[in-house]
Amino acid sequence: MRWPIFIALAVILFVLGNMAYYGGWFGGGPQTSAPAPTDGGPPPSSPGEPVADGGAEQLPDEPVPVEPQEPVDTPAPDVPEPVTFDHHPAGDLIAKSGSGYLDRTVWSPQMCFPFEEAAFANSQVYGPGGGMGPADKPSQCDPSNYSLPWRDNFCESRGYSSPLCANGKGHQGQDIRPATCKKDIHWVVAAEDGVITDIGTYTVTLTGSAAPHRVYRYLHMRMTQLAVAEGAVVQAGDRLGKASNDFGGTPTTIHMHFELRAGVAGTSTDGKAVMVHTFLPPYLSLVAAYDRKRAGGVCQ
């Protein structure tokens, strides 16, 4: 009876020994899991496991995030070109035609442009076809007279009294040619609300209703076809007449001479401050008015 007992004990010891060995009870057998760390750090990676990159672990059922796309450059909105046109600076007269007045004041800032259509400010005397114009360009209809840039001719050499000009004499206004070299076609209009205070042999005078009561004088319209009479009340933009070449008994070139007068502060010969009602350079007021016209502005 001892042999069976002995064999049974041997089998039990054999099984327990294997369990102890493979289970690592005594530190000698293989381990199926990493031992717990003893220094508080993370457990070492088991062979075959991916090395962590320090980021959050992606779970299998989570959607794969879309890679960020390059930012799309949104084009900047178009900036409109400033509304202007080609013109010489104020006071820049044709060479040898006189000394221009270099004033930068817009004396009539809300003035209505005095033509219904496009027009060209330049010199009718020193330009082609004028009495002092270039000999090689004898025609007043020369294309250069009807193209940009504009040119100032206030204070151009003349014998007329004009206190702001050198020696107190010079051209009293600005010459403006109509859209084409044709007379009695293109309408001239009122520069502001006012009254027609005088009609002369070849002049029409408009006095503004509002202070400072500027005075505008128009020359060389077709005087037999005027749209207004002396004493008429007009609004800015109202038709006055058509550009022509009336100049008494001697016709001039086809153009409209435009003057601006108003009271300005001055000093008398004995040093006293006075108000002087005199001719003022209209060029920059015309430039500003033409800019508004080209931009679609209406006379008010």
Where are the regions a protein language model picked out?
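N-terminal Sec-pathway targeting helices
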Residues: 1-11
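Hydrophobic single-pass membrane-insertion segments
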Residues: 17-33
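Ser/Thr-rich, Pro/Gly/Ala-heavy low-complexity intrinsically disordered linkers and tails
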Residues: 28-74
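Residue-level detector of conserved, well-ordered beta-strand and adjacent loop positions
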Residues: 52, 177, 207, 219, ...
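Short amphipathic beta-strand/extended segments with alternating polar/hydrophobic composition
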Residues: 137-157, 216-221, 267-292
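Zn2+-dependent peptidoglycan hydrolase active-site motif and core
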Residues: 161, 183-230, 249-259
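Conserved, short, structured surface segments that act as functional micro-motifs
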Residues: 176, 232-300
